[in-house]
């Protein structure tokens, strides 16, 4: 798998129990090459404008993402997971979307570091 891929992975829910959810692989983390991932949700009303990103049937990369419904890529729903916990590649998002997510997350972290 590589950055920008969409896979299934167990992520903790509000009740603390893990549930298989789609995730976008953002990047591998040192020293063990675990994956920094962000959760994907169909709860579009949870969008943080200018931070999260929606993907749906009108987007060129929706079909190849493997997602079944319009979804929200939630940059505020992060996890670091070993590759062994990634269960099956569903598809991938466009390289431009992947890069935009990384830049947006990096800018957010930089702004918090300076504060």
Question: Predicted regions span which residues?
Answer:
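Conserved functional hotspots at enzyme active or ligand-binding sites that engage polyanionic ligands
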Residues: 1-115
């Amino acid at each position: 798998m590589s950055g920008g891929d969409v896979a299934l992975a167990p992520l903790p829910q509000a009740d603390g129990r893990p549930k298989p959810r789609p995730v976008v692989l953002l990047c591998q983390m040192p020293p063990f090459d675990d994956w920094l991932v962000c959760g994907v949700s169909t709860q579009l009303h949870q969008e943080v404008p200018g931070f999260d990103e929606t993907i749906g049937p009108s987007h060129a990369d929706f079909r190849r993402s493997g997602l079944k419904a319009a979804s929200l890529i939630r940059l505020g729903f992060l996890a670091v997971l070993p590759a062994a916990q990634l269960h099956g590649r569903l598809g991938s998002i466009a390289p431009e979307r992947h890069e935009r997510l990384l830049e947006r997350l990096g800018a957010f972290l930089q702004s918090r570091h300076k504060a």
